[in-house]
Regions:
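Conserved AMP-binding/adenylate-forming core of the ANL superfamily
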Residues: 16-62, 66, 70, 87-92, ...
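Conserved AMP-binding A3 loop
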Residues: 28-30, 153-177
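AMP-binding/adenylate-forming catalytic core of the ANL superfamily
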Residues: 65, 86, 103, 356-364, ...
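Conserved AMP-binding/adenylation subdomain of ANL enzymes
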Residues: 76, 176-193, 201-240, 255
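ANL superfamily adenylate-forming
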Residues: 108-149, 256, 319-320
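Conserved pre-ATP/AMP-binding loop-to-beta segment of ANL
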Residues: 139-157, 164, 187-193
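Gly/Ser/Thr-rich phosphate-binding loop
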Residues: 236-244, 253-326
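AMP-binding/adenylate-forming catalytic domain of the ANL superfamily
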Residues: 470-494, 509-532
Length: 532
């Protein structure tokens, strides 16, 4: 297997097959990589040789971003993917923490830099005449270095769902490793077209999208994700493969279904964090196979599904993946299920997903030894994700380590409750999280987004919960907020910390309440003991 991005790209330098499709234009691999080589040569020529050659990208999902990625690979310097949804001092902080000496942006994002202190950072607008002149004047590419597999290719910031984003050092070897695996798994060839609509500054797009195209020679169709525009794009570009992360499938399924939705070229959708129901429904509606797994930006834990995967499970882990009690640093016993399928031993079975073999491919967080140390303890990698595993090794997610709820003296996690709520047909998206209980501990709160044209009454919701034999009475949401949308990261991951901080102070939608020991829901403020 090819060991670096640099080697992968060099193999395609003379390839006349299509590489990039965007709008009405098509670039061959030869054209795409020739442009990338000039791009890299220009940046290396103007770089400060006394500083790390870190090039930031504040760019959208466009050919310019693909060129910047290829240029970094060919040129042997480090690319820093800057989150385009960050603003103000948070944005400046990311650029600074990544030690960017050069920042590439475009007309769509240039204004985000206005007023920011970016001293020591040279900014180029790739849509400007200045950049065209700099790039055109570049000579032949002499790489900054010939990279080794373990060298850093990109700094990619985590999504920030549970705290401030951290810059993960992504090694060159991770890209060909991921790409070769997915190419083999899904039989991707140069005749395929990879639809890249997830943010290219994020690991999902890099590992589950870009890597697939590089490893197979397939064409890439970069796009900004649009639920209503997805089908038209698939048909326009002849896209046969797409990657996703977070809730895009739910957004697409919320759009009205057409009689010919399955008339499209899509063959495979691969990603993570989709709801079980959405996986099946997307596959049915669009005539494609959906493979959903588990992964993280750090790349230290890999869990994959196969055809035998039971409902609710994300799959089995690679060797070394286990569930550990983080306090005792011992492996948790297998999950035990009662007669109706409910987890009977949550306090013992739920633990943190770890890699007992160590860091795996995780290269640490750039310039953040403390955060790296929190992940690497006792010779193992601790993921921060809660889960339990059955006797056959199938893993079921339970939430993040910060999502434990203490309800009436019982420990609960959020993911199992969310999986049950997803069974209710009107619900399109759901988030379960903790809010303070007026007496002691936590109260369960659920935020719901309904499907297009769907309706839900307090009576219907309560009746549904009562009919779920595997839902503990203590797991019934005390508060239910029905809203039009939920706060998400740039990668469509729900920001539960924002929801928890908001609590009951909602300014839109409908808020329901249930008495502490009752089963009936009513509008908040209209029933007895709303805070009891």
């Amino acid at each position: 297997m090819t060991g670096t991005v640099q080697q992968l790209l060099q193999m395609r330098i003379d390839d006349p097959a299509p590489a990039v499709k965007y709008g009405d234009r098509v670039w061959t691999w030869r054209e795409h990589l020739d442009e990338a080589a000039h791009h890299a040569a220009a940046l290396i020529a103007v770089a400060d040789v006394d500083r790390p050659l870190h090039v930031g990208t504040l760019l959208g999902n466009t050919p310019a971003m693909l060129t910047a990625m290829a240029a970094a690979g060919l040129g042997g310097y480090v690319l820093c993917g800057i989150n385009t949804t960050r603003r103000g001092e948070a944005l400046a902080g990311d650029i600074g923490r990544a030690d960017c000496q050069i920042l590439l942006t475009d007309q769509a994002h240039r204004g985000l830099l206005d007023g920011l202190d970016l001293s020591g950072v040279r900014v180029f607008d790739v849509d400007s005449a200045q950049w065209a002149q700099v790039s055109a004047g570049a000579g032949e590419l002499i790489p900054h270095r010939t990279v080794e597999p373990g060298d850093t290719f990109m700094l990619i910031f985590t999504s920030g769902t549970s705290g401030e984003p951290k810059a993960v050092q992504v090694a060159h070897m991770m890209v060909p490793f991921a790409g070769a695996s997915l190419v083999q798994r899904f039989s991707i060839t140069a005749a395929d077209v990879c639809y890249l609509s997830m943010p290219l500054f994020h690991s999902n797009a890099l590992m589950a999208g870009w890597s697939v195209a590089l490893s197979s020679g397939a064409a890439m169709a970069p796009a900004t994700f649009s639920a209503s525009g997805l089908l038209d794009d698939l048909r326009r570009y002849g896209a046969t493969y797409m990657n996703y992360v977070g809730k895009p499938l739910a957004y697409v399924l919320a759009t009205p279904e057409g009689p010919d939705d399955a008339d499209n070229p899509l063959r495979v959708a691969f990603g993570n964090e989709a709801a079980e129901r959405d996986i099946a429904e997307f596959g049915r509606r669009f005539g494609a196979t959906v493979w959903d797994g588990f992964g993280s930006t750090e790349g230290a834990v890999i869990i994959t599904r196969d055809g035998q995967c039971p409902t609710g499970s994300v799959g089995r882990g690679f060797p070394g993946v286990a569930i550990y009690n983080p306090d005792t640093v011992t492996e948790c016993p297998p999950a035990v299920f009662d007669a109706v399928g409910a987890l009977a031993n949550p306090d013992e079975a739920i633990g943190e997903i770890v890699n007992t073999d160590g860091a795996g491919m995780f290269g640490g967080y750039y310039n953040d030894a403390q955060a790296t140390g929190e992940r690497l303890r006792h010779g193992m990698y601790f993921s921060g994700d809660l889960a339990y595993r059955d006797a056959d090794g199938w893993i079921y997610l339970a939430g993040r380590t910060g999502e434990w709820l203490r309800v009436d003296g019982e420990n609960l996690t959020t993911a199992p409750i969310e999986r049950i709520l997803h069974r209710l047909a009107p619900i399109n998206r759901v988030a379960v999280y903790a809010v303070p209980d007026p007496q002691v501990g936590d109260a369960v709160m659920a935020a719901l987004v309904l499907g297009d044209g769907a309706a839900l009454t307090p009576q219907d919701f309560g009746d549904f919960l009562a009919a779920q034999p595997d839902l503990s009475p203590k797991a019934w949401p005390r508060y239910v907020w029905i809203t039009d949308d939920l706060p998400v990261t740039a990668t469509n991951k729900i920001l539960k910390r924002t929801l928890s901080a908001q609590g009951l102070e909602v300014t839109s939608g409908v808020l329901w309440h249930r008495e502490a020991r009752g089963g009936r829901y009513h509008p908040f403020g209209s029933g007895p003991s709303d805070l009891a």
